[in-house]
């Protein structure tokens, strides 16, 4: 077994052991429904003060023109 193969085997072994240990500590407990909805919404909407191409993509549901660091007016989520 050469060095690269040995390194890959150790990496896979460490990953498997880490996953098993996380499961014993409750790392893979199922999410509550509210948590899952919050995580999904956060991953699909644009957070506050980020550029917004459309109103419906903002987490707050609205965006307004605000001055950026160059003084230009850009649409950002509220």
Swiss-Prot record:
Prosegment residue ranges: 23-42
Record site: Critical for insecticidal activity: 51, 68, 76
GO biological processes: defense response
Entry superkingdom: Eukaryota
Domain comment as written in the entry: The presence of a 'disulfide through disulfide knot' structurally defines this protein as a knottin.
Family statement: Belongs to the neurotoxin 08 (Shiva) family. 01 (omega toxin) subfamily.
Protein name, entry field: Omega-hexatoxin-Hi1a
Organism: Hadronyche infensa
């Amino acid at each position: 077994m050469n060095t690269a193969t040995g390194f890959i085997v150790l990496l896979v072994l460490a990953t498997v052991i880490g996953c098993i240990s996380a499961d014993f500590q409750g790392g893979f407990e199922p999410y509550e429904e509210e948590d899952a909805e919050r995580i999904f919404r956060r991953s699909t909407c644009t957070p506050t003060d980020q550029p917004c191409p459309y109103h419906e993509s903002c987490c707050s549901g609205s965006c307004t023109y605000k001055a950026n660091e160059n003084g230009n007016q850009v649409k950002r989520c509220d």
